[in-house]
């Protein structure tokens, strides 16, 4: 086995180890994971896969493709803990394959591996890959689209890849509306082609060019056409409101007039310099090198870097911003960085910077662990609200172990191999988080602990209704639970809940979020305080506790 093959096996071993460890060891956590998992679970149970539901209401915030994936895996495995995380794992591995293979085709196999390592070791990429949000799947579709379009433009013509690139962008669009940004890659490609850069052709005069847009429309139509036919033929106002919300308010209106997550225009620069560590540490050496490559008219750098810049601009325009919005740009940045990394890592200053990062990260983790073990800091008390005391001890030892291992790695590998110390420290971080941290945090973060206590309090034969609920309560309930709407005003939910309870007063209970305060009509002497979960206090009410409510 030659060295490149050994390095390839080593990369994929670490990728599987880092990304797959912990699969099946936790439940969905807020804010988004329980929502998608609940929708997927209800799809399997109800058989209605076309119109997602959150409890009794239609869920129109996102297209259903991601939830379809979770639901299909739940149907196949019968295990929610595995099914809800598996799409993110598969998408992350697919993204790594795209970037490593593209690097190998445009440069060498070793350059492809550097692109893979730069993507895998970026903190935000791995953090998102170990969560069950939509973003890892969107990143995969966008990266697959860029992969196919770049191969067509730089190594083509290949109209099969051209169609694949457009189709992947379409599937990204029906996963999350922003999937269409993959097609922005054609703008720098067109500029390079029009200016006569060597080896760049879009082949726009070929009649087969139009197969690409057709593939995009066909991919979007997989969901859009049957949804529109069913919704408009249904005749119900709820379904027409669903169409208006998902096609207009959640896309065009949300982009043009964001109603939450307000951030300044430079927010994503901060994200790049923090969440994209340690990869961002190479930028001081990469930027001058990129400038030299662009002067030489090397389109392998212009097209991905131009697209990354367009993605940053696109997401910086609206006021609403979240850190994961620009994650799709990371693989192409890593691709453009990869040919430069061997030279950068040979620089003594780059190794010193990496070593400084390892030492700073390790000392911070060790300090946090020791502070939790030896003191009683305010951040610990706030963090541990609603959790058992043993969780704090376990997390403290986890932080201390990560910090100690990182310091040991820095001493072992030294200044000249700081990149190896970095890989060792981050691997230890993700393994310990997956095997120790996540299971310890699970009961409090997922509402499993709360709902287990609720089930024990009301007994196996009782019925449960939820008021002011969050998705994790309905998902983790040990029995079918009644809900009275999700977006409705809590006072209206409570009034309907009381009426529901009175039809079988001895068997029905209400779980109510305290919010700004329980209704004054409740008999607090009869109400059961179920403690804090996910930062909210919950009360369990029997019919006697709500007797004075109308």
Where are these regions (language model features)?
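Membrane-integral, polyisoprenol-dependent glycosyltransferases
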Residues: 1-351
């Amino acid at each position: 086995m030659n060295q490149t093959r050994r390095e390839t096996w080593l990369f994929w071993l670490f990728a599987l180890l880092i990304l797959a460890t912990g699969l099946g060891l936790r439940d969905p956590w807020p804010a988004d994971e329980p929502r998608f998992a609940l929708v997927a679970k209800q799809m399997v149970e109800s058989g209605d896969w076309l119109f997602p539901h959150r409890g009794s209401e239609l869920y129109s915030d996102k297209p259903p493709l991601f939830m379809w994936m979770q639901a299909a895996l739940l149907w196949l495995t019968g295990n929610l803990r595995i099914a809800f995380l598996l799409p993110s794992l598969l998408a992350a591995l697919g993204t790594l394959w795209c970037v490593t293979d593209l690097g190998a085709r445009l440069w060498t196999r070793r350059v492809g591996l550097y692109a893979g390592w730069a993507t895998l070791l970026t903190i935000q990429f791995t953090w998102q890959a170990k969560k069950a949000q939509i973003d890892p799947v969107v990143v995969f579709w966008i990266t697959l689209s860029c992969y196919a379009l770049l191969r067509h433009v730089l190594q083509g013509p290949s109209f099969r890849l051209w169609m694949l690139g457009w189709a992947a962008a379409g599937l990204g669009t029906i996963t999350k509306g922003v999937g269409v940004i993959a097609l922005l890659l054609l703008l720098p490609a067109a500029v390079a082609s029009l200016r006569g850069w060597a080896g760049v052709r879009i082949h726009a005069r070929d009649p087969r060019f139009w197969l690409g847009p057709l593939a995009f429309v066909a991919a979007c139509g997989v969901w859009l056409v049957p949804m529109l036919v069913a919704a408009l033929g249904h005749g119900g106002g709820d379904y027409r409101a669903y169409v208006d919300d998902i096609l207009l308010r959640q896309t065009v209106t949300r982009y043009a007039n964001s109603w939450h997550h307000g951030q300044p225009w430079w927010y994503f620069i901060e994200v790049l310099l923090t969440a994209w560590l340690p990869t961002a540490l190479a930028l001081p050496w990469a930027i001058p090198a990129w400038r030299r490559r662009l002067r030489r008219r090397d389109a392998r750098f212009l097209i991905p870097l131009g697209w990354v810049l367009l993605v940053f601009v696109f997401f910086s325009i609206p006021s609403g911003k979240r850190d994961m919005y620009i994650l799709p740009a990371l693989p192409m940045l890593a691709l453009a960085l990869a040919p430069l990394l061997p030279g950068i890592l040979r620089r003594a200053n780059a190794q010193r910077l990496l070593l400084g990062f390892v030492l700073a990260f390790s000392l911070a983790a060790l300090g946090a662990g020791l502070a939790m073990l030896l003191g009683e800091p305010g951040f610990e008390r706030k963090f541990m609200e609603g959790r058992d005391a043993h969780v704090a001890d376990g997390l403290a030892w986890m932080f201390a172990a990560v910090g100690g291992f990182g310091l040991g790695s820095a001493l072992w590998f030294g200044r000249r191999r700081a990149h190896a110390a970095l890989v060792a420290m981050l691997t230890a971080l993700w393994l310990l988080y997956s095997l120790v941290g996540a299971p310890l945090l699970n009961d409090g973060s997922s509402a499993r602990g709360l709902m287990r206590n609720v089930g024990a309090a009301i007994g196996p034969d009782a019925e449960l209704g939820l008021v002011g609920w969050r998705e994790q309560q309905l998902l983790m309930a040990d029995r079918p639970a009644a809900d009275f709407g999700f977006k409705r005003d809590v006072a209206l939910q409570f009034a309907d809940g009381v009426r529901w309870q009175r039809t079988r007063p001895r068997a029905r209970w209400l779980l109510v979020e305290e919010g700004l305060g329980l209704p004054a009509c409740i008999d607090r002497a009869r109400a059961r305080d179920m403690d804090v979960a996910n930062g909210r206090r919950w009360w369990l009410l029997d019919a006697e506790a709500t007797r004075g409510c109308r």
